[in-house]
Amino acid sequence: FRGMIIQIGKNFQEISVKDTVIEVQAGALLSRTARAAWNAGLTGFEFAAGIPGSVGGAVAMNAGAYGGEVKDVLLDAEVLTQEGEFLTLTGEELDLSYRHSCIFEKNYVVLSARFSFEKGESDKIKARMDELAKARREKQPLEFPSAGSTFKRPEGYFAGKLIQDAGLKGYTVGGAQVSEKHSGFVVNRGGATAEEVAFLIKQVQKKVMKQFNVMM
């Protein structure tokens, strides 16, 4: 690998609440940010409570679940360009769409984000978060490490069903496996390497493309 990997973690996790706006540094976890919104009586981020990842990554890929996504609540994000320039960009300027933004194409680094919410009732917000957490436990392979839902949903299809129909549920490469509980997840059954995970994903995409002429 020729390049630099920047881990934005412990030193970039501050969360501040001002009225209905929450400003979050990129290293803060989505789960922690969702709890901050709940504690402030703000609704709109319940969908993100169970997504495994950071705010920076969520902005970069326009993360979403259960009918909500980052672009619905994002005011703007501060990014660092390759030239060392700091920019503040709106969701429209970031070209947010389904699991996409211009951040990867332009090699931006997300530093922080501001989200705008609506006032809500704390008990209803918590109830919705609990409801989604229960749904995740029932349907997703939370008993194994994973990076969450792995494949983008092709328009008009469900990725998990395509993978299952291709006979790939349980397909294994080393320690990496297509989950037997939910085919849209790649899990680590123990000792999986990045190379094994990447190879498995490519094989799944290749086999689904061959059988159904659909790219995931």
Task: Please report, for each region that a protein language model flagged, where it lies by residue.
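Gly/Ser/Thr-rich helix-start
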Residues: 4, 28, 51-58, 65-68, ...
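N-terminal glycine-rich flavin-associated loop
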Residues: 4-42, 69-88
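Acidic/polar active-site rim loop that often engages polyanionic ligands
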Residues: 16-20, 59, 108-112
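Short acidic (Asp/Glu) patches
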Residues: 31, 61-63, 92-98
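A gly/ser-rich beta-alpha-beta helix-loop segment of oxidoreductase catalytic cores
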Residues: 37-75, 146
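Phosphate/pyrophosphate- and phosphate-bearing ligand-binding catalytic cores of soluble enzymes
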Residues: 80-216
